[in-house]
């Protein structure tokens, strides 16, 4: 969602997820700075960029706009799906980001003339920085958030 409250739409046409953006890869890490010998915590957790890969789609120009203008996006929700014991797809985990800056966009087009890349679509790697992140494991409603401007005990 952009800073005016408008949803940035992707090209997914799967029933129930129409207009969302399909993410094919995701990487994010958090590091707790500690003293090497004692393990004593020396600073607040360091959050890396929230990085993901997606196909170039209708959301791409909006993400480029946010990057090039310094626009703050209000929120983004990443939903994780799996196949349950009944063979049905279900959402089981969710990561929500708030007050997001698009910090990098890298486009990639593999050499589609080479056989191994012939069926690969054009993709882009997006990096987000954020002020708040919330992790939500749906089974049991387990939720935790971390924010740059709040202390969590």
For the regions a language model picked out, list residue spans one by one:
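Glycine-rich, low-complexity intrinsically disordered segments
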Residues: 1-153
């Amino acid at each position: 969602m952009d800073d005016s409250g408008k949803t940035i739409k992707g090209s997914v046409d799967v029933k129930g997820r129409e207009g969302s953006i399909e993410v094919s890869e995701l990487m994010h890490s958090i590091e707790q700075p500690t003293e090497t010998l004692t393990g004593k915590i020396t600073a607040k957790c360091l959050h890396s960029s929230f990085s993901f890969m997606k196909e170039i789609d209708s959301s791409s120009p909006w993400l480029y706009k946010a990057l090039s203008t310094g626009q703050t996006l209000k929120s983004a929700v990443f939903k994780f799906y799996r196949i349950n014991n009944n063979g049905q797809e279900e959402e089981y985990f969710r990561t929500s980001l708030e007050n997001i800056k698009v910090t990098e966009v890298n486009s990639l087009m593999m050499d589609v003339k080479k056989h191994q890349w012939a069926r690969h679509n054009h993709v882009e790697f997006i990096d987000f920085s954020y002020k708040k992140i919330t992790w939500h494991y749906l089974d049991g409603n387990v939720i935790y958030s971390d924010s740059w401007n709040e202390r969590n005990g």
